[in-house]
Amino acid sequence: MSLKRILIMLLIGAVALCFSGCDLVTANTEELLSPPELTGELRLIKEALESSVNTPITLKYPSSGEYRSPVILRDVDSDGTDEAFAFYSTSDTELTSMNLSVVKYNKKENRWFALDRQTLTGSGVEKVVFSDLDSDGTEEIVVGWEIYAASEKQLAIYSVGETATTQRMLERYTTFLSTDLDEDKRPEILMQFLDTDAATNTASLIVLDENGVLKYGQCSMDGNVKTVLTPVLSPLSNGRPAVYFDEIKGVGAITEVIFFSKGELQNPLFDKEKLENKITLRDSALHINDINEDGILEIPIAKELINADITSTEKLNYTSWCAFNGENFTEMKLSVINTLDGYRIDIPEKWYGKIAISKNTEKRERVVYNYITDKEPSGEADETGEIGDMVVTLKTVTHSEFNSGRGFDKKKAVEICRGEQLVYLAIIPENTEGSVKVTIEELKQMIVPMQF
């Protein structure tokens, strides 16, 4: 390397150090990841808070939901002036307390001042929601407190007065969200709590009245699940508002749909006799999805598919994407999904019950065959038929494998589509017999990359 090039490299390095904005000797990960200091009005609010508490505080950021700031400005009483809601922790010996303080602005004195604070032992804030639950014109603040990280949480509801904040409820929960399931133009909180020790799972619809908390709707859910994913507020296919819960059950997943009807909270997919939901049980990688982009969520439901590999005992399935109206399912799309390679095959109606598939995970191949049977498809695999001619071989390769031509027959394989890392290929045999046939152009419409 020439002396000139060495000098240029040293100069570039020196300039980079000057403009790096941190001390390479003293910087550490905690400092680099620490949140920015509050400025302007928020700084004044924090100073008012610190003067009222008289102990060091650490601002706490909600980990999910719409509000992610430790200090939230919102006009909850519609008087034209924002109130500030501050979340912070304080430490006393070995205990850490989580705190909520409402900080108001005094126009006459041109300063912020803190009301009394609400305190409980905990570790963080999961989510914050504002909702007028007692219809008095002032929004309540609904806080999901993390007691022991995500393993135990408590839901608190607070009402804000002129001079004090009142706690209206404090209960254990797993998930919650603001809804209007009964469509009375009055918001409610739908709270769900999974008690894995007791194997119970319950959804409750909560409002406030003059006597306090009113749970005017409650229903059981599957208590055999281990994990509840984030619930989604979305309409049924008939337009009625509902909340969809995807849950992990054993090695699979289920969906429960909660809505309000006939004066009660309903969960019709829950079998009250067997105390579980089995009708939606499928691969754990499959979740609710608006698969046809019509604004209605579809639930993935498993239907048996013939395994063409007679040496394999593995059960294969179609995935039926179904809209739900609260009583019945309507199939919107039928797919065969490869979760390992990240794609689905949207199956034409005329193929249903007339194909069998073999899978080779090591070679990243799926082979579709004709399946010869006189029986009409019923959702259960008809094993009385026969495996017929091959329809198509689907193969997945990486971009580098595709570019180098490794691992597949370049003369026969045709690219159907590609994702960020993978290329999906098809090989259609010549002179195939059978009722099911396909072209490359049809496959390009049928195969869709998916993320799992």
Where do the language-model regions lie?
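Surface-exposed amphipathic alpha-helical segments
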Residues: A426-F452
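Beta-propeller-forming repeat regions
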Residues: G21-I357, S400-G419, V423, Q445-F452
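Charge-rich, low-complexity amphipathic helices
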Residues: L7, M98, T373-D374
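Active-site donor-binding loop signature of nucleotide-sugar glycosyltransferases
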Residues: V160, T396, I428
